[in-house]
C-alpha cells in the first residue's frame, strides 16, 4: 500500500514551532522529496517515484546486513578508495529518499530506515569520521562528494537519528569541510568546487544549528560572482574555466550553476540569504555562457571535458541537468529575466525529442516545469542564430536555423584536453580543432559515439597519425580565436601540439549556410607517420546514402549533409563498423562491446609533408542535388589559402573575411593588416562594418588595418579603434592591448 501523507504531515507540523534552521531543513527536505502539491497522476511524477523506489530497493536488497560485515556492498569493499566511500553514502542517500518520499511503497518503511541507520553507523565507524588522520586517494570525495551526500542524509533522516548520531556525522563533515574557502588543506577553492563546498557546509550547519558556520558558508559564496580574467570561473566573453586551463561550461560549469541555484533557493528569505549585488551576474551567465552552448537540449561536448567518457553522462543528460538548474534560477530572477529564462528552458525541453523533458529535473521542479510547458503565455523561445567567439577558452559556436557548429581549439593559454582519475583516456585530439555539427540527428554524439569513434580521426582535426599526446599540455602557439560580426565569424588556430613534430594553420569561416575550412603550412618532422586532416567522421545508421560526384567536387551524406571540395578529387572516404567500450576510455566504464557505423572523409597529406594544404566547405541541410548545384556555381570564393593569409568572400552577403598569419604587412582581397589578426568586412544596407580581433591575445600594442573602401561617417565605434583616414581607403588603428581576444568593431556609412 502506498502511504502518501502521514510521515510528511508529521514532519511539516514541526514548522509551526520551527526556528530558522528548521525552516531551512524543511525547505531542503521538500526540494529532495517533491514537497506539497504533487500531482501523482502525472506520468513524469509516477516515473520519478518508481525510479526512487527501484533504486532504493536495489541498494537495500544488496546491502550486507550481517553484524560482522566488512563492507556494506561487495563492489565497494576497498578501504583505500575514496570514491567508494562517496558511492556508499550516495547509496544510503538513495535508500533514505525511498524512505522519505511520499507516493511510493517504501515511504515510511521502518525496516528500511533501521537498516540505513545501521549501515551509516558502520560507514562512520570504518570509513569516514572525524578521527581519520588525513585524506587519501582523491581529496574531492573527502571534502565535497561525501559531505553533499551525507548532508542530505541528515536532512532526510531528521527525527530518526539520535542527537549523538547527528553530532558524529556532522563532525565527520566538519573534519573535511570546516571552511568552504579552502580545499586540499590550504588551496583557495574556486568555481564549482567553492559552491560544492559551501553546500556541504550549509547542510551540516543546518543539521546541528551552527549559525557561525552557516554564515561562513553563505559569505563564502560571494567570491564566485565577480568575473575573472584568469583561472577558474566565468569570463566576460561567456567562457567558463575549471582546473586552471580547461573549458568546462558543460561540466563543472553546469554543476556550478545547478548547485548554486539549489543553494540560493535554499537560503532565500533566511537570515543567511546571499545578498551580494554581484549575484545578478548569474543571469548574464545564463544568456552569455549557457544559451549558445545548448542545442535542442544537448550541451555541446566540447565544453564537457573528461565527462564525455562517462556512459551515464551524455550531451543531452548534461543539457537537461543545466536546464534544471537554470529553471530553478529563473524562480529567483527579476520578472523580465525570469520570463526570458523560462522561454529559453522551454525551447530546450520541447525541441529535444530524444529525451523526456523531466529527465534531470528535481522532483520538486517537475510540477512547475509541467505548468511552464502548458503555459501559452510563455512561448518557447525558438532558435537563436548567431556566432560566438569564446576567446578565454578557445571555443567557437555558430548557430543557424536547423543546425549548429562548434570548434574546439587549444593554445599556449588553454590545455589540449583533460584526463585525470583515469577518465577521457582517448581524448588526445579533442582540442586540435575538432568540429561538432549539430543537426536534427539529435543523438549523433550521445549514441555510443565516444567509445566507438576513431580517436585519431576526429572531424576538423589535423593529426599526426598514431600520435597520443599527454593531457594538460598547452600548445606551441598563442594563436587561437577569431572575430565575429552580425552572426558571421572567422576563426583561426596555429596548431602546434605537444611533441613539436606537427604544425598547421587552420581557419574556419562561419557563414549563413556554410562553413568554409582552410588549412595551410602543414608540416611534420616525423618521417614515418602520415598527416591527415579529417573532414568528417559521422555516426550513421543502416545504409545511409553517401553520394559522390565523379570529379570529386562534391559529396552528400544521408541526403541532407553536403560537402564541397574546391580542388576536386584528392580526398578519401570510408564506411566502417567500429567497436569499442566505455571501459577503453574510462576505467570506471563497462567493458561490454559497442558497435557503431561511421562515414569518414579525410585528406591524406602523406608522411613528413612540407607546406601541405586543404580546403573544403560543409553544407548542412543540403541534398545531393543542392550540393551539386553549389559545386557548379560556388557561392563562396576562396581568395587565398597561403602561409600568410586565409581569405574568403561571399558577394551575396557583402562579406569578406581574412585571417592574417604573420606580423608583417599583408594585403588579401583589399584588406591590409600589419599584424596577426582576424578581420571581417561586411557591407550591406548602406553601411560598412569592420570587425577585428587579436587571436594571440599577446599583442600589447595595435593592429593597423586598411580597407579598400571609403566611408562617409561613423555610426558606431569601439573606443579602442582610431580612424586614421576615411577616404579614399579606410585606415584604422586598433588598440588590442588587454582586449583578451575580444572582437573590436566599427560601423560607418558608405557613399
Where are the language model's segments positioned?
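Sec-dependent signal peptide recognition
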Residues: 1-7
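Hydrophobic h-region of N-terminal signal peptides that target proteins for export
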Residues: 9-17
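Intrinsically disordered, low-structural-confidence terminal and linker regions
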Residues: 18-44, 748-751
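Aromatic-lined, polymer-binding surfaces characteristic
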Residues: 42-45, 57-311, 316
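Extended polysaccharide-engagement surfaces of secreted carbohydrate-active enzymes
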Residues: 263-689, 693-715, 724-726
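C-terminal beta-strand-rich structural cap/linker in extracellular carbohydrate-active enzymes
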Residues: 392, 562-564, 612-615, 729-751
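Solvent-exposed serine/threonine-rich low-complexity stretches and specific carbohydrate-binding patches
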Residues: 717-727, 731-735
Amino acid at each position: 500500500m502506498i502511504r502518501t501523507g502521514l510521515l510528511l504531515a508529521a514532519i511539516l507540523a514541526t514548522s509551526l514551532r520551527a526556528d530558522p534552521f528548521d525552516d531551512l531543513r524543511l525547505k531542503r527536505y521538500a526540494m529532495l522529496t517533491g514537497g506539497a502539491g504533487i500531482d501523482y497522476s502525472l506520468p513524469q511524477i509516477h516515473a520519478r517515484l518508481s525510479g526512487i523506489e527501484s533504486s532504493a530497493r536495489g541498494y537495500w536488497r544488496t546491502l550486507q546486513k550481517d553484524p560482522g560485515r566488512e563492507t556494506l556492498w561487495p563492489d565497494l569493499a576497498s578501504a583505500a578508495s575514496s570514491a567508494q566511500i562517496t558511492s556508499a553514502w550516495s547509496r544510503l542517500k538513495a535508500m533514505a529518499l525511498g524512505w522519505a518520499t511520499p507516493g511510493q511503497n517504501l515511504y515510511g518503511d521502518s525496516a528500511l530506515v533501521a537498516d540505513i541507520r545501521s549501515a551509516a553507523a558502520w560507514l562512520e565507524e570504518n570509513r569516514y569520521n572525524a578521527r581519520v588522520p588525513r585524506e587519501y586517494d582523491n581529496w574531492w570525495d573527502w571534502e565535497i562528494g561525501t559531505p553533499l551526500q551525507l548532508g542530505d542524509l541528515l536532512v532526510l533522516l531528521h527525527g530518526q537519528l539520535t542527537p549523538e548520531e547527528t553530532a558524529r556525522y556532522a563532525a565527520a563533515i566538519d573534519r573535511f569541510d570546516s571552511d568552504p574557502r579552502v580545499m586540499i588543506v590550504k588551496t583557495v577553492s574556486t568555481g564549482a568546487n567553492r559552491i560544492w563546498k559551501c553546500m556541504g557546509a550549509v547542510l551540516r550547519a543546518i543539521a546541528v544549528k551552527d549559525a557561525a558556520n552557516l554564515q561562513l558558508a553563505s559569505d563564502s559564496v560571494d567570491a564566485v560572482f565577480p568575473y575573472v580574467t584568469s583561472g577558474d570561473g566565468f569570463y566576460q566573453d561567456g567562457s567558463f574555466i575549471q582546473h586552471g586551463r580547461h573549458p568546462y561550461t558543460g561540466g563543472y560549469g553546469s554543476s556550478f550553476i545547478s548547485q548554486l541555484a539549489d543553494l540560493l533557493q535554499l537560503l532565500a528569505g533566511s537570515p543567511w540569504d546571499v545578498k551580494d549585488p554581484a549575484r545578478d551576474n548569474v543571469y548574464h551567465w545564463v544568456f552569455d555562457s549557457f544559451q549558445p552552448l545548448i542545442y535542442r537540449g544537448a550541451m555541446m561536448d566540447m565544453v564537457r571535458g573528461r565527462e564525455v567518457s562517462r556512459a551515464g553522462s551524455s550531451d543531452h543528460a548534461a543539457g537537461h541537468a543545466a536546464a534544471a538548474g537554470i529553471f530553478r534560477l529563473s524562480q529567483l530572477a527579476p520578472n523580465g529575466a525570469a520570463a526570458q529564462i523560462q522561454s529559453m528552458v522551454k525551447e530546450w525541453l520541447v525541441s529535444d525529442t530524444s529525451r523526456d523533458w523531466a529527465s534531470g529535473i528535481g522532483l520538486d521542479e517537475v510540477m512547475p516545469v509541467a505548468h511552464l510547458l502548458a503555459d501559452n503565455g510563455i512561448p518557447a523561445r525558438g532558435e537563436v542564430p548567431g556566432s560566438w567567439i569564446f576567446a578565454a577558452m578557445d571555443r567557437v559556436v555558430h548557430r543557424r536555423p536547423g543546425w549548429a557548429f562548434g570548434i574546439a581549439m587549444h593554445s599556449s593559454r588553454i590545455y589540449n584536453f583533460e584526463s585525470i582519475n583515469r577518465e577521457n583516456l582517448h581524448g588526445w585530439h579533442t582540442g586540435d580543432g575538432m568540429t561538432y555539427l549539430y543537426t536534427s540527428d539529435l543523438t549523433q554524439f550521445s549514441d555510443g559515439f565516444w567509445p566507438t569513434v576513431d580517436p585519431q580521426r576526429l572531424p576538423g582535426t589535423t593529426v599526426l597519425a598514431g600520435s597520443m599526446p599527454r593531457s594538460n599540455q598547452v600548445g606551441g602557439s598563442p594563436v587561437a580565436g577569431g572575430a565575429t560580426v552580425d552572426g558571421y565569424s572567422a576563426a583561426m588556430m596555429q596548431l602546434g601540439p605537444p611533441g613539436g613534430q606537427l604544425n598547421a594553420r587552420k581557419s574556419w569561416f562561419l557563414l549563413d549556410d556554410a562553413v568554409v575550412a582552410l588549412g595551410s603550412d602543414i608540416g611534420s618532422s616525423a618521417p614515418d607517420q602520415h598527416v591527415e586532416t579529417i573532414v568528417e567522421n559521422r555516426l550513421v545508421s543502416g545504409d545511409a546514402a553517401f553520394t559522390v560526384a565523379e570529379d570529386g567536387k562534391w559529396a552528400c551524406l544521408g541526403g541532407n549533409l553536403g560537402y564541397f571540395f574546391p580542388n576536386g578529387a584528392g580526398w578519401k572516404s570510408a564506411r566502417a563498423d567500429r567497436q569499442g567500450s566505455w571501459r577503453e576510455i574510462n576505467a570506471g566504464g563497462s567493458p561490454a562491446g559497442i558497435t557503431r557505423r561511421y562515414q569518414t572523409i579525410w585528406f591524406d597529406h602523406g608522411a613528413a609533408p612540407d607546406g601541405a594544404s586543404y580546403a573544403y566547405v560543409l553544407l548542412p541541410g543540403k541534398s545531393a542535388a543542392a550540393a551539386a548545384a553549389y559545386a557548379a556555381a560556388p557561392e563562396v570564393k576562396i581568395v587565398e589559402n597561403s602561409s600568410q593569409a586565409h581569405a574568403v568572400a561571399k558577394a551575396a552577403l557583402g562579406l569578406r573575411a581574412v585571417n592574417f598569419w604573420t606580423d608583417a604587412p599583408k594585403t588579401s582581397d583589399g584588406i591590409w593588416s600589419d599584424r596577426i589578426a582576424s578581420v571581417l568586412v561586411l557591407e550591406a544596407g548602406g553601411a560598412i562594418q569592420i570587425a577585428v580581433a587579436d587571436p594571440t591575445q599577446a599583442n600589447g600594442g595595435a593592429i593597423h588595418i586598411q580597407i579598400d573602401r571609403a566611408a562617409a561617417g561613423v555610426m558606431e565605434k569601439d573606443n579602442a579603434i582610431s580612424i586614421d583616414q576615411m577616404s579614399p581607403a579606410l585606415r584604422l588603428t586598433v588598440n588590442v592591448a588587454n582586449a583578451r581576444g575580444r572582437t573590436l568593431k566599427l560601423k560607418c556609412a558608405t557613399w
